[in-house]
């Protein structure tokens, strides 16, 4: 007991093994503790969907971003920049089938998850709701700059066709996804012509002739700067 008390009083430091044990048992993040002490260090957050409970962890990631974006409505200096090789979440998450397809593709690629037919995959309503909130609130960002890979739509079309060819998406459902994609392109055309969202905030779109290997995003507000790199379909590395 005395050894424990000495550690709690700070007289004796915890060993790495002891610190790891405390972290695991109590759910304390050692990264965050270190980050508080060393402000000059770059801290990274791996927003990885847990394959043991993919829906819940995916929901938690989106909900965290929704809470963040919800604070930006009254920030006149909020800005988002992204260079993408896929259609950004800020645009496709409002469309249920396109959002479902992105999650379905991740599940198919993950060997730990037994992938179902697209029509059999049931997305919980709370995920649909938080996706809609994410897409709607993102329009409150006062300035958004999109730089897109010229293949951004072709990548998605090829993926959809692949799953159709292996009979995991029916012809009828493929047509439904196509209709959502056409609706999305109409929305993009309107945004590109106006240069603004429905809330009157600025949007700039540039199509690059150079292909991107990943998607990179940067969000800046009066209070913070956030950088994100998309990894493995729906996951991200954030700092």
Question: Which stretches of residues belong to each language-model region?
Answer:
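Helix-turn-helix/homeodomain-like alpha-helical modules used for DNA recognition
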Residues: 38-116
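Charged/polar, solvent-exposed surface patches and flexible loops
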Residues: 6, 24, 32, 60, ...
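Basic, Lys/Arg-rich alpha-helical nucleic-acid-recognition elements, primarily the DNA-binding modules
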Residues: 1-47
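Hydrophobic protein-protein interaction segments
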Residues: 105-239
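Short secondary-structure junctions and interdomain/linker hinges
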Residues: 3, 69-72, 76, 188-195
């Amino acid at each position: 007991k005395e050894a424990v008390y000495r550690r709690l009083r700070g007289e004796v430091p915890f060993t790495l093994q002891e610190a790891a044990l405390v972290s695991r048992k109590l759910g304390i993040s050692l990264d965050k503790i270190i980050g508080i002490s060393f402000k000059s260090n770059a801290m990274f957050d791996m927003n990885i969907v847990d394959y043991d409970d993919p829906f819940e962890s995916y929901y938690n990631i989106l909900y965290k971003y929704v809470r963040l974006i919800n604070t930006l409505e009254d920030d006149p200096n909020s800005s988002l920049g992204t260079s993408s090789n896929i259609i950004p979440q800020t645009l496709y998450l409002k469309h249920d089938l396109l959002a479902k397809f992105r999650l379905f593709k991740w599940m198919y690629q993950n060997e730990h998850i037994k992938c179902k037919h697209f029509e059999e995959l049931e997305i919980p309503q709370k995920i649909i709701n938080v996706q809609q909130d994410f897409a709607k609130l993102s329009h409150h960002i006062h300035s958004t700059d999109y730089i897109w890979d010229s293949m951004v739509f072709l990548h998605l079309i090829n993926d959809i066709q692949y799953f159709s060819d292996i009979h995991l998406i029916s012809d009828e459902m493929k047509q439904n996804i196509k209709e959502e994609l056409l609706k999305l392109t109409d929305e993009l055309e309107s945004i590109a012509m106006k240069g603004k969202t429905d809330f009157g905030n600025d949007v700039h779109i540039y199509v690059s002739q150079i292909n991107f290997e990943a998607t990179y995003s940067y969000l800046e507000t009066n209070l913070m700067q956030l950088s994100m790199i998309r990894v493995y379909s729906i996951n991200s590395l954030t700092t």
